[in-house]
Amino acid sequence: MAIKIDWSIYPDRERKAKFTQKLTPESPYKSAGVSVIEVKKLAKTINDDDIELNYLEDVLLKGIIIASRKESFAEKRKKLEAFYPLFISWMATDSVAPTLYIPKKDKKEAYRYFIKLTEDKDPMTSRFAFVVLMGHFLTEESIDEIMNKAIAIKTDSYLLKMGIAWLTSSCYIHYPEKTSKYFSLLDKEISKMAKQKCRDSKRVSPEAKKSLHNL
């Protein structure tokens, strides 16, 4: 029997729900008005991912439980793939991805899997793959392969474009010299978004921000 979460115990829900729903108009689920931080805390107390889905927070909770469970990547992959249709909002992809537990012995297998997953026809699943790569696999050795996947994307999905822009800005923060060449190769709108994210970031030096004008 699915677990029904009582979100009513959390304070200030109405205000938070309105705010979340403005940020996630694409979600078919209304917000319960509970922060992602609180959802993550709750996920640590529940092992069963059979959650009754009534609110966006229920979706986040289910995904975080699946992602954070300590098990082999082969086991986790099956459960993740069953969850992919529930990536109905950027908040779902971006909340689940950072919590993903991958055993050290499975890192290479997982990396190859998510590299391939960037090609998924569903834009939200593809976004999830890019966010996972950004958070778990971005190194000086992997950046070229990851960015080559990014420049290959042709999409009308604003949320996928924004996800790739976020990835690109993260690459530029950590590896500006290696990332610079990719701005001109990206979809024009993605490149524009990525540059703006870099300009807005306090982690990009003034010199690196100036360099963006020539990219």
Question: Model-derived features: where do they sit?
Answer:
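Alpha-helical scaffold domains
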Residues: 1-215
